[in-house]
Amino acid sequence: MARSFSQLAINAEKQRTSLAVSKKPTDQPELEIHTLGNSALRQSAKRISKVDKNIRDLVKKMLHSMYAAKGIGLAAPQIGSQQQLLVIDLDIENSATPPIILINPEITEFSATIDTYEEGCLSIPGVYLDVIRPSSIKVNFRDEMGRPKKINADGLLARCIQHEMDHLNGVLFVDRAINEEALNKELKEHGFKKKDVLRLCSD
C-alpha cells in the first residue's frame, strides 16, 4: 500500500487545509459517533449549499473525534449531521501530513479494476470484513473554504473515500461484505444485530 500513501502525500500537499488540528488522541471524542442500529446512519445526506464558519467548526470537531477514536475517516452522518462532508487522514501518526476535507464529493470516474480488502468502521467497532471496490477513482469536491478541488485516488485513499461516501447514502461497509458467514460471526461476536444490515451483495 506504499503507493497509496505516496499518492496521499502528493494530494494532501495540494489540498493542504487550514483546519488541521492536533492528532494527539484524547480520552473522549468531541462528538458522539453513532453505531450500527442508529437510524441516522441510514439517512441520505444533503449537499452543503454554503461553506461557512459553522461548517469549518464542524470539520474541526469531526477531526478531533476521528483522532480520538483512532480512525482514518469520518463522515458527517456518523455524528448525526446529514450533510455531505467527509474528513480523511490515512497517516494519523504523522503530524506533518494534513487531513483531507471533502465537501459535496462526487466520484466522476471508477477504474475497471477492482480490489478486495478488509475494512472496518468507527460506527461498527471491532468488525472487520472483506469488501470489493474499484481500485482507483476520480473525485470532485469542495474544500473547507468552498474552493473546487479534484483528486485522482488509488489504493487505500480510493477505498477510504468510497467507504466514507457510502455513509452519505446511508450505506455501511457491512452491507457490502462479500462473505455472509464471516459477517454473521463478526456481528454476533461484537454485539451487533443482523437485522440492521442491508445486504448489497451475496456470496
Curated annotation (Swiss-Prot):
Catalytic site: 164
A molecular function (GO) term: metal ion binding
The UniProt record lists the keyword Ubl conjugation: no
Protein origin, superkingdom: Bacteria
Alphabetically ordered keywords of this record: Hydrolase, Iron, Metal-binding, Protein biosynthesis
Database matches in CDD domains: Pep_deformylase
Enzyme class, broadest EC rank: hydrolase
UniProt-annotated binding residues for Fe cation: 121, 163, 167
Keyword Metal-binding: yes
Cofactors demanded by this protein: Fe(2+)
Catalytic activity reported: N-terminal N-formyl-L-methionyl-[peptide] + H2O = N-terminal L-methionyl-[peptide] + formate
A GO BP annotation: co-translational protein modification
EC number of this enzyme: 3.5.1.88
Cofactor note: Binds 1 Fe(2+) ion.
Matching InterPro entries: Peptide_deformylase, Peptide_deformylase_sf
Function: Removes the formyl group from the N-terminal Met of newly synthesized proteins. Requires at least a dipeptide for an efficient rate of reaction. N-terminal L-methionine is a prerequisite for activity but the enzyme has broad specificity at other positions.
PANTHER family: PEPTIDE DEFORMYLASE
Family, as annotated: Belongs to the polypeptide deformylase family.
HAMAP family: Pep_deformylase
Name of protein: Peptide deformylase
Taxonomic source organism: Prochlorococcus marinus (strain SARG / CCMP1375 / SS120)
